[in-house]
Amino acid sequence: MEKIIFDKIYNKNCLDGMKLIDKNKIDLIITDPPFAINFKAKKANYNRKDSNVIEGYNEILPEDYYQFSYDWISESNRILKESGSMYIFSGWNNLKDILIAIDNVGLTVVNHIIWKYQFGVVTKNKFVTSHYHCIYVCKNPKKRKFYSFSRYGKNEKSDDGHSLHYRDKEDVWEIKREYWTGEDKTPTKLPAEIIKKILLYSSKKHDIVFDPFLGSGQVAVVGKMLDRHFCGFEIVKEYYNFAQKRLRKNEYRLNKKN
């Protein structure tokens, strides 16, 4: 049987790959699973040129989304340590299936975080969606790790006199999207600032961080930058190659000259 090595990523279906990881092995999972919303991955918007967007984005059929969610969340629960946590990002369209799967698997919801970003997609006959959901869950509430003062000290203040520690721990995060103009990119990626924030609050150096839907490799790349061990699976060969190249070159952004 193939052995999964950490500090390495794999071009593999995560449902197959996670079965090769021992139970109670992973400290932290951060992931943004595929959509089921007819997402137009090649659309040239927000300064994104079609020619720079790597093809291959995979979606899940809406009628299959609950079972898909249950399957990968169940495996995630198996490989998480008792002290481990998971952050699942989702649009509102797929949120119901994910929340039901979390309950049925037996994980505990710690927080429901809102990522508020700038510039939602323009709409005609409904309100503009300009946020994303992040469900923070844990395996064992009594053993869950959370490093409360990893980013700001208890008495650190902003210029206007407010507590930076309190503000940073609020459950609405206003963090800008990253736009890689003129550079190769995948259609979706979480900003490095979000991943750094999660890594600092829910892991420490040399912990093992895992992403079952690696995409462009953000979780692995940022995890490596912060001295975490990493692992992840990406089923799309083009995305895997892109992520592998970023890790190999130790470069956050790649352009066509690289």
Language-model segments: residues:
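Class I S-adenosyl-L-methionine-dependent methyltransferase module
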Residues: 244-258
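Core catalytic lobe of class I
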Residues: 2-241, 248-250
